[in-house]
């Protein structure tokens, strides 16, 4: 509906969107009951040594109605209605079991963790329990958080991440460069890896944007952290990584 002084005009588009989200919320509950979620592992590639160096776990909804929509849409809805906790627990259990299979190759798998999960009472303990239950070795699992995550409650986030790192988890800082934190955060967060956001990768071949990304890499390396450049989709972008000393890349060029 749109309001214009003396009358209200019905807007079918808005109503359809409301109905769509309501239906999706109902289907999310059924999806958990019917085991419709599955995990997909996107490789993080070592462009210098030409090998797979790690994987990021990504959730997919095996339902004809939602198979082609971005996971971000239903994950955001799950965060709002509280289902993210149950979905997150499924992800942890599935990924930790798979991580055991990759251990002999020295390859870590990362899981994306939302603020709702990390701030949930007992979540860190749950991660530690599953880690122990699957008899995983230190370095087998990486917890991935976004840069904007740090704005929620910085000191609490750092405390929880330190606990995880001290118990053998790797820490990945995702979407770096898209938030409002200063470069000093690189020295405060206990991260092993910083992931440069795709929005920067898209522009490395435009004007002097590549030089900016190169300088960003120098700051990150100065903080003693590894770098994964996200959104690598072309051979030109891969060559940029190699020529500027970026060791790891992730994106559709390596695997869809």
Name each region found by the language model.
Residues 2-5, 21, 48-53, 71-76, ...:
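Regulatory and interdomain segments flanking nucleotide-handling catalytic cores
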Residues 7-11, 17, 47-56, 81-157, ...:
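Catalytic core of bacterial c-di-GMP phosphodiesterases, primarily the EAL and HD-GYP domains
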Residues 9, 13, 20-77, 112, ...:
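Active-site core of bacterial EAL-family cyclic-dinucleotide phosphodiesterase domains
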Residues 47-48, 64-66, 99, 114-121, ...:
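EAL-family c-di-GMP phosphodiesterase catalytic domain
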Residues 160:
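Conserved functional hotspot residues or short segments at active or partner-binding sites
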């Amino acid at each position: 509906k749109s309001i214009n002084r003396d009358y209200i005009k019905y807007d079918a588009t808005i109503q359809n969107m409301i109905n769509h989200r309501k239906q999706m919320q109902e289907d999310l509950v059924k999806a958990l009951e019917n085991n419709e979620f599955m995990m997909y592992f996107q490789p993080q590639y070592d462009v210098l040594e030409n090998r797979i160096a790690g994987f990021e776990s990504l959730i997919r909804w095996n339902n004809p109605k939602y198979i082609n929509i971005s996971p971000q849409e239903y994950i955001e809805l799950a965060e709002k209605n509280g289902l993210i906790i149950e979905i997150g627990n499924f992800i942890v259990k599935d990924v930790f079991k798979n991580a055991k299979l990759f251990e002999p190759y020295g390859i870590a798998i990362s899981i994306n963790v939302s603020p709702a999960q990390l701030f949930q009472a007992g979540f860190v303990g749950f991660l530690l329990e599953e880690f122990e239950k699957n008899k995983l070795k230190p370095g087998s699992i990486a917890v991935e958080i976004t840069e904007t995550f740090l704005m929620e409650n910085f000191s609490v986030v750092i405390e929880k991440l330190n606990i995880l790192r001290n118990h053998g988890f790797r820490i990945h800082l995702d979407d770096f460069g898209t938030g409002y934190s200063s470069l000093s955060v690189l020295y405060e967060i206990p991260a092993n890896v910083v992931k440069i956001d795709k929005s920067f990768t898209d522009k490395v071949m435009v004007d002097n944007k590549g030089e900016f990304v190169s300088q960003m890499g120098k700051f990150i390396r100065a903080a003693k952290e590894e770098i994964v450049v996200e959104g690598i989709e072309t051979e030109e972008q891969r060559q940029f990584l190699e020529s500027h000393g970026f060791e790891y890349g992730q994106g559709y060029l390596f695997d869809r």
